[in-house]
């Protein structure tokens, strides 16, 4: 039996790529990779004693505020990924996880950083309980939370009405963070062939910032356009609430 102290440095779990997780080319969707990352994070937390009842008893929950993925190699239907995860930093209300996925020959196919905020029973940010840095043996203050600042949306941006589907809502009653990746990719499909090529390229990076929660059944405005970030070509994405124009989420797809 694995002793809790052996879990401090992280865990590794195998995942077989399922038929329903792949697109027409037989390659796993980016959102499925992010779903693996959140699932293995839960497994790690549970094995250390921080399961859903533990959080419910204390009125606490983690909410993802930013994610960055590096997709280094295509992963095909039926492949098995060895997915490892570890906490790499804490700061006040924040925690960062790093997740890596390797093919059966050891090739690194994916890395992912997810930045989480601890929230209380009101849904407001609250300090990370002292149990966490102690359990994960991580020194606080060791990372800068991810942000995706974007310029105003240009007039020629592709526009796609985005509807939150019932299957996008997770057990916390939130739109799952991986669903936003589906929304991003749907907007890029609407933007045309160049955007679609960037979305399928390897290596590539995807950066997401979750600005505010989308409500279940919400109808939102998704827009995508070509952009340059530090002289590199990129595709930008914005999801906004049409009622007030405020951003719900922002994203970038960049060369690897």
Feature map (PLM): residue ranges:
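HotDog/MaoC-like acyl-thioester-processing domains
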Residues: 2, 7-13, 70-150, 210-219, ...
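Hot-dog-fold acyl-thioester-processing enzymes
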Residues: 2-64, 119-205
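Acidic/His-leaning functional-site neighborhoods
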Residues: 166-250
């Amino acid at each position: 039996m694995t002793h809790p102290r052996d879990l401090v440095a992280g865990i590794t779990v195998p995942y077989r790529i399922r038929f329903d997780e792949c697109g027409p080319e037989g390659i796993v969707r980016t959102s499925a990779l992010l779903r693996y990352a959140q699932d293995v994070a839960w497994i790690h937390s549970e094995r250390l004693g921080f399961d859903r009842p533990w959080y419910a008893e204390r009125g606490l929950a983690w909410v993802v505020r930013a994610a960055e993925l590096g997709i280094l190699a295509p992963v095909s239907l039926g492949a098995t990924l060895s997915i490892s995860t570890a906490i790499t930093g804490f700061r006040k209300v924040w925690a960062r996880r790093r997740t890596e996925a390797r093919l059966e020959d050891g090739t690194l196919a994916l890395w992912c950083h997810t930045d989480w905020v601890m929230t209380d029973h009101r849904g407001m940010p609250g300090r990370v309980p002292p149990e966490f840095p102690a359990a994960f043996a991580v020194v606080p203050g060791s990372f800068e939370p991810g942000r995706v600042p974007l310029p105003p949306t240009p007039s020629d941006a592709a526009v796609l009405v985005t509807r939150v589907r019932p299957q996008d809502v997770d057990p916390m009653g939130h739109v799952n963070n991986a669903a936003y990746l589906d929304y991003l990719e749907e907007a890029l499909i609407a933007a045309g062939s160049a955007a679609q090529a960037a979305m399928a390229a390897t290596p590539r990076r995807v950066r997401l910032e979750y600005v505010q929660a989308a409500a279940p059944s919400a109808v939102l405005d998704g827009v995508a356009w070509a952009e340059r970030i530090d002289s590199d070509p990129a595709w930008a994405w914005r999801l906004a609430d049409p009622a007030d124009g405020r951003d719900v989420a922002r994203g970038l797809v960049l060369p690897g």
